[in-house]
From Swiss-Prot:
Any one Gene Ontology molecular-function term assigned to this protein's record: ADP-ribosylglutamate hydrolase activity
Entry protein name: ADP-ribose glycohydrolase AF_1521
The organism of origin for this protein: Archaeoglobus fulgidus (strain ATCC 49558 / DSM 4304 / JCM 9628 / NBRC 100126 / VC-16)
UniProt function note: Removes ADP-ribose from aspartate and glutamate residues in proteins bearing a single ADP-ribose moiety. Inactive towards proteins bearing poly-ADP-ribose. Catalyzes removal of a phosphate group from ADP-ribose 1''-phosphate (Appr1p), but with low efficiency.
SUPFAM superfamilies for the chain: Macro domain-like
GO biological process: peptidyl-glutamate ADP-deribosylation
E.C. number(s) listed in UniProt: 3.2.2.-
Length: 192
């Protein structure tokens, strides 16, 4: 895990890190989930496997939590399902916050941006509500959902800048691969 950038945004310490989000020392990590919380690939699969040792089992746990927390089998943009981090608790990670970003398929619009903004803001608000002081995000929707990484990072930064809260002290964006992390770093440097 390498921290590439750190800055203060109000009372929040904002970081950009390159590495595996399941290794990041935050109280909550965010999962870029699909609306039915089926953790079949990408960061969702990696987080599910790290938490429960088996992605299928963690999918079942997540779906049960979604039914308990929302009374239905899907979540919308901005809604957050909270599950225990299980095996990751030994690393100090207590919760996984499941959020749903938009499917861009290479396109971008105000509507897609609004959905993505909600996907970033929702977990920040949930962290505030639960008194969680540190939270790490992946680049929601930048993988298989095909949103432009620069737009994703810009939207993430906008959500953090606009977030109003006092409990959350540290927010990180964790990017797995070096090339993408360098793209994100350029956005951080010109935005902060």
């Amino acid at each position: 895990m390498e921290v590439l950038f750190e800055a203060k945004v109000g009372d929040i310490t904002l970081k950009l890190a390159q590495g595996d989000i399941t290794q990041y020392p935050a109280k909550a990590i965010v999962n870029a989930a699909n609306k039915r919380l089926e953790h079949g690939g990408g960061v969702a699969y990696a987080i599910a496997k790290a938490c429960a040792g088996d992605a299928g089992l963690y999918t079942e746990i997540s779906k049960k939590a979604m039914r308990e927390q929302f009374g239905r089998d899907y979540i919308d943009h901005g809604e957050v399902v909270v599950t225990p981090a299980m095996n990751l608790e030994e690393r100090g990670i207590k919760y996984v916050f499941h959020t749903v970003g938009p499917i861009c398929s290479g396109m971008w619009s105000e509507e897609l941006k609004e959905k993505l903004y909600k996907a970033f803001l929702g977990p920040l608000e949930k962290a505030e509500e639960m008194g969680v002081e540190s939270i790490a995000f992946p680049a929601v929707s930048a993988g298989i959902y095909g949103c432009d990484l620069e737009k994703v990072v810009e939207t993430f930064l906008e959500a953090v800048k606009n977030f109003k809260g006092s409990a959350v002290k540290e927010v990180a964006l964790v990017i797995y691969d070096r090339k993408s992390a360098e793209v994100a770093l350029k956005v951080f440097e010109r935005s902060l």
